[in-house]
């Protein structure tokens, strides 16, 4: 009897070891029928408007599956709400890797959240393509498992500052930034360009992502004499800033990152105050007549009729496009190594965003952005086409 009990105990232990993947050796993330892909994003919380990025990626994966998958494998897609909280990001990613056996992540809003998990993903040899944010710590030094599409915030902020000074002829500029890696990366690019012109910012003011009362910060900008204010903040903070300024009679030329370039949404939630705001942009307009954009727009209308087709939602497709392309080029004998090889051989890939180039020595895909202005009713007015940052130091290394 004791021998039978011992045998049963050993059998249970062995089965449990087989069933549960460990943190140090995650499941391969695919089999003959499916490839498991995931994304985190703020479906709730202060950055909830960015949550549509993760939902938008599903359109591309559904199109792939409708066409029979990639080399016979369908994509099984997982989304987790991290509430724009790095602690929640870590918990969600750990659960996905260790319990679901994820092959790769795409997108992923929040620079702080991404920094919290990038090393964990690399240690578990999980690929991450197209973070929905961009800081230099992602790609310098090269992380063999992380491939960035998003222009570096330093590059974008530098180009926007150049536009303000050279095109708008404004020299009194302030910078309003989220007090984290996202906001501080934009601040670095702003300072780089201002130093190039030998100009001094009239004000640099930080804000916490969850702050609701911005009266003191906006009064400081007004009293500084800033004629233009660049903001590197989340959508909720941006709207509070504009509404606060409207009440104190302060109307600078607002400028922001492409993270706030979903004009239809921003125009709506700001009560029309977003009209006239200038932002960076790194995709074609969502109402463009380009065949690929038309294809995605029609697919979204059919597959997700309750979703609003906008830039944030479409960006989810953009971030996933190069990953799908690499899976196709990796061939039917899929492995992490085969996919990495294909990603490192990406040359002038063009979806609905900028051209993307990766190599084993360079995982920053682009530094080009466009500059748009919000027109009446949330329409897009192009001010400047694709432009690379002439001060980008990373390309000279």
Language-model-detected regions and their locations in the chain:
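Short, low-complexity disordered leader/linker segments with a strong preference
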Residues: 1-36, 389-397
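Immediate post-signal peptide segment of exported/extracytoplasmic ligand-binding proteins
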Residues: 24-39, 66-74, 165-171, 333
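Extracytoplasmic "Venus flytrap"
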Residues: 27-31, 38-58, 80-87, 109-110, ...
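Beta-alpha junction/loop-to-helix N-cap segments that form part of ligand/metal-binding clefts
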Residues: 34, 49-56, 67-140, 207-212, ...
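Short glycine/serine- and small hydrophobic-enriched flexible loop segments
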Residues: 62, 243, 321-329
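Extracytoplasmic ligand/sensor domains, especially the bilobed periplasmic-binding protein
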Residues: 87, 99-205, 253-278, 285
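Extracellular/periplasmic periplasmic-binding protein-like sensory domains
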Residues: 242-317, 374, 387-394
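Segments of small-molecule ligand-sensing domains
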Residues: 302-313, 324-382
């Amino acid at each position: 009897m004791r021998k039978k009990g011992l045998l049963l105990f050993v059998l249970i232990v062995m089965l449990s070891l087989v069933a549960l993947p460990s943190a140090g050796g995650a499941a391969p993330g695919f089999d003959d029928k499916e490839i498991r892909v995931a994304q985190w994003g703020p479906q709730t919380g202060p950055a909830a408007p960015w949550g549509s990025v993760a939902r938008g990626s599903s359109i591309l994966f559904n199109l792939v599956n409708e066409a029979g998958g990639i080399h016979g494998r369908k994509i099984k897609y997982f989304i987790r709400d991290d509430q724009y909280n790095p602690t929640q990001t870590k918990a969600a990613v750990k659960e996905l890797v260790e319990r679901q056996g994820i092959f790769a992540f795409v997108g992923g809003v929040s620079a702080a959240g991404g920094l919290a998990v990038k090393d964990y993903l690399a240690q578990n040899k999980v690929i991450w393509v197209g973070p929905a944010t961009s800081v230099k710590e992602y790609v310098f030094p090269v992380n063999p498992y992380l491939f960035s599409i998003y222009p570096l915030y330093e590059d974008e902020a530098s180009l926007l500052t150049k536009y303000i000074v050279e095109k708008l002829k404004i020299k009194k500029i302030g910078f309003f930034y989220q007090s984290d890696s996202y906001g501080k990366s934009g601040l670095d690019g702003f300072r780089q360009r201002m130093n190039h012109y030998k100009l001094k910012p009239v004000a640099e003011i930080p804000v916490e992502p969850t702050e609701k009362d911005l009266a003191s910060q906006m009064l400081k900008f007004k009293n500084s004499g800033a004629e233009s204010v660049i903001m590197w903040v989340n959508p909720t903070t941006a709207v509070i800033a504009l509404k606060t300024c409207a009440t104190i009679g302060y109307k600078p030329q607002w400028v922001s990152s492409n993270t706030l370039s979903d004009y239809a949404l921003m125009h709506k939630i700001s009560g029309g105050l977003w009209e006239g705001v200038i932002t960076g942009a790194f995709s074609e307009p969502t109402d463009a007549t380009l065949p690929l954009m038309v294809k995605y727009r029609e697919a979204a209308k059919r597959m997700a009729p309750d979703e609003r087709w906008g830039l944030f939602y479409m960006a989810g497709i953009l971030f996933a496009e190069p990953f799908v392309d690499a899976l196709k080029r990796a061939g039917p004998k899929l492995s992490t190594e085969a996919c990495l090889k294909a990603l490192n051989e990406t040359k002038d890939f063009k979806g609905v965003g900028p051209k993307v180039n990766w190599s084993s020595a360079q995982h920053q895909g682009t530094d080009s952005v466009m500059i748009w202005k919000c027109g009446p009713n949330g329409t897009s007015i192009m001010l400047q086409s694709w432009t690379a940052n002439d001060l980008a130091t990373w390309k000279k290394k």
